[in-house]
Amino acid sequence: MKGLYIKSYGCQMNVYDSLIMENIIKPLGFTVVSEPSEADVVILNTCHIREKASEKLYSELGKIRKIQENKDLTIVVAGCVAQAEGEEIFERSPFVDIVVGPQSIHTLPELLVKAHRIKKQVINIDFPVISKFDAIPVEEYTKNQETSAFISVQEGCNKFCTFCVVPYTRGEEYSRTVEAIFNEALVLADSGIKEITLIGQNVNAYHGTYKGCEWDLGKLIQHIAKIPNIERIRYTTSHPRDMHQSLYEAHKLEEKLMPFVHLPVQSGSDRILKKMNRKHTAEEYIDIISHLRKQRPDIAFSSDFIVGFPGETEEDFENTIKLVEKVKFSQAYSFKYSPRPGTPGAEYPNQVPEEIKSERLLRLQKLLREQQLAFNRSMIGETCTVLFSSKKGKFDNQIIGKTAYMQSCYINTDNPSQFYNSISPIKIIDAHQNSLTGVVC
């Protein structure tokens, strides 16, 4: 058997795509290996959201080239950097054999055979998103997923935020049919999956069809919830502009839908939000949060923030702080703005100096960490349901599960295997910055 090594960067969609690539390549006589030095094919499934992601790719390629010098090794660059940079990757790293975009991954077996046969570099960065889903049997999406699984319901983006490359690397919005998604969920349920996360670049923009009628995400969630063996449903990543009544109702009515929403806001300044082309205000975002809390009082939120967007003043940044103080997030992701080539933001004047961006990021992250710790500590003494896989902690008798709020929860037990792939009531006895400690009830 030949060795296959895949390294995935970035979002959940890349994790999902990496699993697909693994499953469609293994029938060619490959087995997955844990180190690139053991591989005959190395795939780097890249992200292009942040500047450092590209830097990480070329740094990793430099390391893998040293392996290639001593063995016959095929190097594949996949994902959004592949889509954005295309032939430039061959120019910067001429030892790379294949470049394939995220909507062309279904052609990888053919590309591997072609590259081996003609001994030349090959590239496919087309946008055949529909043929991508049509070309890959549902079984290939669902293999090797243990307790939780992703289902891609929507890909691409039509929002064109001025800081973001996704519309250029993933293409326009496309929604899969209800039947295709439901069939995939059925296969996952039959394989023992307990939790499904519906994913998309703008997942709540989902508008798939069922028997000639258009469905939204809220209706899709309630349909999937009818599958008996599926006990938890999540969705990510959503956009404030695409929140809708049906989704609010799903949070109110469907117990299987977890009380946790990742809803990126990016900034608390209306002026900056307008420059970002977000097409919502800070107050509209807060109204969405309030409405969701009315529907589901125990709901919690995470978000994304960008500090130092071009032209951001101290007053703009303080408005972001005020929004964070008002919402109170259970967790969040925050970054310094980095110009992405080809986006409008990269051409804006008044780029914020790096030292100011760093100082603001530290202030924001301090507040976000305080809120996360406070939320975790509020769980002490509570009994919550925890979904366990077979993931172990640092010690032989320790296993790790996941709460409804995506917190890691550690328990000690003499028989860890009894909890594998199960949901159990756990009493929380301690809380830390990024995790909880519990005991079996």
UniProtKB/Swiss-Prot annotation:
One of its GO terms (molecular function) is 4 iron, 4 sulfur cluster binding. Its EC number is 2.8.4.3. Keywords: 4Fe-4S, Cytoplasm, Iron, Iron-sulfur, Metal-binding, S-adenosyl-L-methionine, Transferase, tRNA processing. Residues 2-117 form the MTTase N-terminal domain. Its cofactor is [4Fe-4S] cluster. Binds 2 [4Fe-4S] clusters. One cluster is coordinated with 3 cysteines and an exchangeable S-adenosyl-L-methionine. It comes from the Bacteria. It catalyses: N(6)-dimethylallyladenosine(37) in tRNA + (sulfur carrier)-SH + AH2 + 2 S-adenosyl-L-methionine = 2-methylsulfanyl-N(6)-dimethylallyladenosine(37) in tRNA + (sulfur carrier)-H + 5'-deoxyadenosine + L-methionine + A + S-adenosyl-L-homocysteine + 2 H(+). Residues 143-374 form the Radical SAM core domain. Its main location: cytoplasm. [4Fe-4S] cluster 2 binds at C157, C161, C164. It holds the Pfam family Radical_SAM. [4Fe-4S] cluster 1 binds at C11, C47, C80. InterPro entries: Elp3/MiaA/NifB-like_rSAM, Methylthiotransferase, Methylthiotransferase_CS, Methylthiotransferase_N, Methylthiotransferase_N_sf, MiaB_methiolase, rSAM, rSAM_horseshoe. Monomer. Belongs to the methylthiotransferase family. MiaB subfamily. HAMAP family: tRNA_metthiotr_MiaB (MF_01864). This is tRNA-2-methylthio-N(6)-dimethylallyladenosine synthase. It comes from Ehrlichia canis (strain Jake).
